[in-house]
Amino acid sequence: MIPRRTLLSLLVGALSAASLPALAQQSPFDLGPEQPGRIRADEDPAAIAAVPKGFKFVEPGVLTVGISPGGPPLTTYATDAKTVVGADPDFAQLIADSLGLKLNLVPLAWADWPLGLTSGKYDAVISNVGVTEQRKEKFDFSTYRLGLHGFFVKADSKVTSIKEPKDAAGLSFSVGGGTNQERILLEWSKQNVAAGLKPLELQLFDDEAARLVALRGGRVDVVVQPHAQLVFIAARDKDIKRIGTLSAGWPLKSDVAITTRKGSGLVDALTLATNNLIRSGKYRQALARWGIEEEAVERSETNPPGLPKY
């Protein structure tokens, strides 16, 4: 029997694929399967040499990467409803190029990546996985993006910038109930009240569409959710704009990383390859292609401090 969680994830993927023609017509990015604008890299001798001699890839000569098509611009299905495209697939291609390997992207339900990785189905997972102390017990990480939430407002809003709690005093926000964003904004509100400032007003919604309706209808001043999603919506609809970003682990930094099996030996080569891609400029070009340069890291780290349990 297929687990209910997996079945729901697959159903969401199928529904997303069914809506691809309409999505492609509206998309500000190239969602075609050919991807002629994809950034490519040369082989990186240093990174190749860092792969342990005894390391066995799932398929010889191929980097097999588990990836979850959760939505643009990070990862989604192309207009052929089978090719996976987006910022994470582009980054995976750069890593495969650097290691002198072909790339095989294997779509998966996001909740299934830990089991798939530990069971040896994939060499790595590149799918918006955040570094946490709990995950570090079983996996190795090479960071490649910042985990950010975005503050977005209507294009004609008088709210121009949110960088810290005091900037949000007295404003109303649409946010997902039970999310990390809600946790952070509640703490911001407490800090403001303690400082004699107005609290934040939070309106909780279960889905993105409702949050955006609240913003566009003037019920709230600001919408808060994962940054990349809002970048895509802003570029597509042109009626909202970014006024700030927020670490997904505030007050701590939140890292997104290539994930590999603990002790597999591949992590050092992946970190080295990523840093050389950063130095060459190709890394930032790949992020810019999907509008998420704000999420660029200055350098890749191996197993940095991860977020604690909240």
Feature-to-residue mapping (PLM):
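N-terminal export leaders
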Residues: R4-L8
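Ligand-binding clefts/hinges and TM-proximal coupling segments of bilobed small-molecule sensing domains
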Residues: D30-A47, N180-A195, R242, N275-Y310
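Extracytoplasmic small-molecule ligand-binding "clamshell" domains
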Residues: D30-N128, R289
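Ligand-binding cleft/hinge of the Venus flytrap
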Residues: A78-T79, Q93-L99, Q181-L204, A234-K238
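Short helices/loops that flank or line small-molecule/ion binding pockets
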Residues: L94-S98, V106-P107, A111-A124, K138-F139, ...
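A ligand-binding cleft/hinge motif common to bilobed small-molecule-binding domains
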Residues: D112-L115, V129-K136, I184-V193, G217-L252
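Periplasmic-binding protein-like
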Residues: L146-V153, A235-L272, I292-Y310
